Amino acid sequence: MVNSSAVKVVCIEDEREMIDLVQLILTRRGYEVHGALGGREGLALIEAVQPDLVLLDLMMPDMDGWEVYQQMKANEHMKSIPVIIVTAKAQSIDKVLGLHIAKVEDYITKPFGPSELLAAVTRVLHEAGIEIEGA
C-alpha cells in the first residue's frame, strides 16, 4: 500500500483549464500531477516522469489522443502505463472503441465531477496493483 503522494499522474490535454482542474482535484488527495499541453509535449513528459497513470484527452490539435496512446503502447518504457481517456466525445461508439478495441483502462466524459475522476483513478491504479492508503 502506498501513499497517494508517491503516485505520479500525467494529464495530457489541449486546454490549460482542464489540466488545472485535474491538478486541483488530484493534488488535494496528495497525487503528484504533471500537465502537458498536447500530445507531443505529453509523450516527452511521460518519458521524463515515468508516471503511474496517464489521463489522456482524445481531441487535440497537434496529435490526437489515439495517436499518443498507440505511441505509448509501442514504446517499451511506456506500454505498461495505464491510461484513462478523458474526453468530451460522449458517444457510446467511442467508448466501445476505446475500452474494447484499444484496451484503454477507463474512459471519463467531460464534464465530470471530482468523485467520478477520483473513483476512476483509484480503480485503475488498483487494477494496476497500486493500492492507495485511505482510498
State where each predicted segment sits:
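Conserved acidic carboxylate
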Residues: E13
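Receiver (REC) domain active-site loop signature in two-component systems and cognate sites
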Residues: M60
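Alpha4 helix (beta4-alpha4-beta5 surface) of REC/receiver domains from two-component response regulators
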Residues: Q23, E67, A90-Y107, A119
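Active-site beta3 strand of CheY-like receiver
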Residues: V49-L55
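C-terminal output helix
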Residues: P111-T122, G129
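Charged docking surfaces used in two-component/phosphorelay signaling
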Residues: D20-R28
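Helix N-cap/capping motif at the beta->alpha junctions
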Residues: G35-A44, G65
